[in-house]
Amino acid sequence: MTANVDGVPEKFATLGLTYDDVLLLPGASEVLPNAVDTSTLISRNVRVNIPLLSAAMDKVTEARMAIAMARQGGVGVLHRNLSIEDQVNQVDLVKRSESGMVTDPITVHPDATLGEADALCAKFRISGVPVTDPAGKLLGIVTNRDMAFESDRSRQVREVMTPMPLVTGKVGISGVEAMELLRRHKIEKLPLVDETGVLKGLITVKDFKKAEQYPNAAKDAEGRLLVGAAVGASPEALDRAQALASAGVDFLIVDTSHGHNSNALDWMAKIKSSVGVDVIGGNVATRDGAQALVDAGVDGVKVGVGPGSICTTRVVAGIGVPQVTAIYEAALAARAAGVPVIGDGGLQYSGDIGKALAAGADSVMLGSLLAGCEESPGELMFINGKQFKSYRGMGSLGAMQSRGQGRSYSKDRYFQAEVSSDDKLVPEGIEGQVPYRGPLANVLHQLVGGLRQTMGYVGAASVDEMESKGRFVRITSAGLKESHPHDIQMTVEAPNYSRK
């Protein structure tokens, strides 16, 4: 057996490092943390304002989390443990949550009942809807105020709506002009109509207020919040991808446990050629794996095999690469091709984000750090007087089981789609709980604040400079112990630190 210069057999020569194995060296710096640029590309054509994505997991990201992530400048990736219709509806909820102008507003027919109109308002969290005829001509508007004191929910909308003429705007109106009309007439909604009176859009005062409230929000060219979605690698995935693209999703992630698999690569290429949005491939953990994704034509590479807190792939299958090394190796292939890298999993502290970026990632995907947030879909539990939220891996039994519904949308991620009986599944994840952490905005404030401090220490004014200027020192177990608070009993907890 051949050996390297240290006498280690070549087969065992690679040293794998993860976040706790390294620290970043402080460097000469003229950079102030509050002046750094945290924007980055997560794929060839999608840019966010902070380098954070919420994971495509059913206890982490649905519409509420995706909306909150985009408002803070990041982006959420909707999980795929849903039917195609339900996942498309999640995209629609995000895209309709706010926009510069709603180009396809929800409308109601004048013969609809108040109960039906109220249900629409509740579903999309809106305060009113335009009333149109079958040809799309604007007839009036019905709002919560019109319906508030109507006890008979079977009455028709035409009986209580505010009919035309309404204050309207022309298609192409500027934001300044629209705001002036809203202010002058003391209204909250401005329908936009063409010369024949057909409804073409809707501008609301709520969207102007949200733009002021969330100035760092990540938005598309139409002023709508960014959102991504996960799909699999199967014939069903092609239908799912096309439906999601039609719904306005900004990018797709072909989400498999082993992206360096010929079947997965074939489906990535097929999906990429059939949709008009960026496609990110994953997951891989080697340079060769990343190169295979690049060769398949993906717009982004997602890195991570087994680093997540709820993942058991490394012990069940004996497979994986410690995450810092995995990111570094994958970036050698991806960066040369101009393809952004996403480090997925294994992050415990804000300092790990900077380490991932210095290793070669353009952004990171977070699961456990966000699972305890108010906006996550996990169940809230009280245990011994403390609050927790449920969290699980997508390879856990709970995520892969069909539960009598005849279909699971998660099994194929781990190449077990053909397993017909739940008791024959081989899980690669666990189920558990994480402490409740409150609103996402507070959590991201600490994470991004920690990243800004990292960039200041390194002397990196941008995310790109983190990779070029970041230098590592490998540490021992004693060095790791020294890095954490020690020789003291902590009496007041910090919002950004807890001993794991």
PLM features per residue range, with description:
Residues 1-28, 108-109, 169-170, 230, ...:
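Alpha/beta catalytic cores of nucleotide-metabolism and tRNA/nucleoside-modifying enzymes
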Residues 71-86, 249-261, 299-317, 347-381:
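Glycine-rich phosphate-binding active-site loops on the catalytic face of alpha/beta enzymes
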Residues 80-95, 131, 135-151, 182, ...:
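Terminal amphipathic helices with adjacent charged low-complexity linkers/tails
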Residues 34, 83-92, 150-154, 174, ...:
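Active-site-adjacent beta->alpha loops and helix N-cap segments on the catalytic face
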Residues 34-48, 55-57, 86-126, 131-133, ...:
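Bateman/CBS regulatory modules and CBS-like beta-alpha motifs in cytosolic regions of diverse proteins
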Residues 47-54, 100-105, 164, 220-230, ...:
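Short beta-strand/loop segments at the ligand-binding rim of alpha/beta enzyme cores
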Residues 64-67, 239-246, 285-303, 343, ...:
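Catalytic cores of alpha/beta
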Residues 78-81, 107-108, 128-130, 168-170, ...:
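Catalytic beta/alpha-barrel core
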